[in-house]
Amino acid sequence: MAGREKTKSANRVLRISQLDALELNKALEQLVWSQFTQCFHGFKPGLLARFEPEVKACLWLFLWRFTIYSKNATVGQSVLNIQYKNDFSSNSRYQPPSKNQKLWYAVCTIGGRWLEERCYDLFRNRHLASFGKVKQCMNVMVGLLKLGELINFLIFLQKGKFATLTERLLGIHSVFCKPQNIREVGFDYMNRELLWHGFAEFLIFLLPLINIQKFKAKLSSWCIPLTGAASSDSALASSGKECALCGEWPTMPHTIGCEHVFCYYCVKSSFLFDMYFTCPKCGIEVHSVQPLKSGIEMSEVNAL
């Protein structure tokens, strides 16, 4: 007896796995219905509205035929390696649900949802006294059903068996398709993630301490003489037709005491970021940022 109880506890499906299977089933139904409605996208609007409960019931019946009826498991359960077992069977070995249980499962799930949607449409525009009483009785029955589902869910959270009220009434519960072995937990992925997170935090702390602008200026001053393009660039920079930092026509041209010209934004932002900013072309330190004299500026413009 102890060995049998130990085997049952080892093969017991986790609560989260059963709930995940239900969520996967709902996601599949939404996907199937959205894809089906796309087929009627070019038809007259509201074509499926009148027969929507019946169309949905046919689709869910089609899914039931090729999942629970033939494979003893829903799509969500198949993904999680779970299937239904007949709980009324006295045999300790696996016994699939009987044909009657599968048929009643379709009646309770598919037929119940169809009846709820269709009754709502029937009683929506009826104002007779007889229909009012029937509608009130239906509301009471739906309320009792939801109360039963709530109580069943609380029992499921305590015992981990029969995730839905339909499963409890029909005597079917979820079991693993194959016996589950003890899993070996590896920490390689976790260690790698911790190392990468630590390295990223180190870079976030270190990068603000590095003067990127000065490093780029030094690198450009070293690379320009090596490329052999310094003759034309220096001629443009010295003539005042090119910003020594961005390489474009200088906007609000300013100088820093050398022959090169800078955009006001380029030189001011660089100077505010680094008080020891030097010209990337000639290496002269910035003493003061002065606007380019109008006479020189106009002569350069007229020369174009």
Swiss-Prot record:
- Broadest EC class assigned to this enzyme: transferase
Q: Please provide, in alphabetical order, the Gene Ontology terms of the cellular component aspect for this entry.
A: Cdc73/Paf1 complex; peroxisomal membrane
Q: Which InterPro entries match?
A: PEX2/10 (IPR025654), Pex_N (IPR006845), RING-HC_PEX2 (IPR045859), Znf_RING (IPR001841), Znf_RING/FYVE/PHD (IPR013083), Znf_RING_CS (IPR017907)
Q: Where does the sequence pass through the membrane?
A: 15-41, 48-73, 98-124, 133-159, 187-210
GO MF term (any one): ubiquitin protein ligase activity
Catalytic activity of the protein: [E2 ubiquitin-conjugating enzyme]-S-ubiquitinyl-L-cysteine + [acceptor protein]-L-cysteine = [E2 ubiquitin-conjugating enzyme]-L-cysteine + [acceptor protein]-S-ubiquitinyl-L-cysteine; S-ubiquitinyl-[E2 ubiquitin-conjugating enzyme]-L-cysteine + [acceptor protein]-L-lysine = [E2 ubiquitin-conjugating enzyme]-L-cysteine + N(6)-ubiquitinyl-[acceptor protein]-L-lysine
Query: Which Pfam families does the entry mention?
Result: Pex2_Pex12
Q: Which UniProt keywords apply?
A: Disulfide bond, Membrane, Metal-binding, Peroxisome, Protein transport, Transferase, Transmembrane, Transmembrane helix, Transport, Ubl conjugation pathway, Zinc, Zinc-finger
List its EC numbers: 2.3.2.27, 2.3.2.36
GO BP terms in the entry: cellular response to reactive oxygen species; fatty acid beta-oxidation; negative regulation of epithelial cell proliferation; negative regulation of fibroblast proliferation; peroxisome organization; pexophagy; protein destabilization; protein import into peroxisome matrix, receptor recycling
Peroxisomal matrix topology ranges = 1-14, 74-97, 160-186
Zn finger spans (RING-type)? 243-283
**UniProt-listed Gene3D superfamilies:** Zinc/RING finger domain, C3HC4 (zinc finger) (3.30.40.10)
Where does it reside? Peroxisome membrane
Q: Where does Zn(2+) 1 bind?
A: C243, C246, C263, C266
- Modification after translation: Forms intramolecular and intermolecular disulfide bonds in response to reactive oxygen species (ROS), promoting higher stability.
Major location (coarse): membrane
* Annotated pathway: Protein modification; protein ubiquitination
Membrane topology type: Multi-pass membrane protein
Q: Where along the chain is Zn(2+) 2 bound?
A: C258, H260, C279, C282
How it assembles, according to the record, is: Component of the PEX2-PEX10-PEX12 retrotranslocation channel, composed of PEX2, PEX10 and PEX12.
Q: Which PANTHER family match?
A: PEROXISOME BIOGENESIS FACTOR 2 (PTHR48178:SF1)
Family the UniProt entry places it in: Belongs to the pex2/pex10/pex12 family.
State the protein's purpose.
E3 ubiquitin-protein ligase component of a retrotranslocation channel required for peroxisome organization by mediating export of the PEX5 receptor from peroxisomes to the cytosol, thereby promoting PEX5 recycling. The retrotranslocation channel is composed of PEX2, PEX10 and PEX12; each subunit contributing transmembrane segments that coassemble into an open channel that specifically allows the passage of PEX5 through the peroxisomal membrane. PEX2 also regulates peroxisome organization by acting as a E3 ubiquitin-protein ligase.
List the protein's name. Peroxisome biogenesis factor 2
Give me the gene this protein comes from.
PEX2
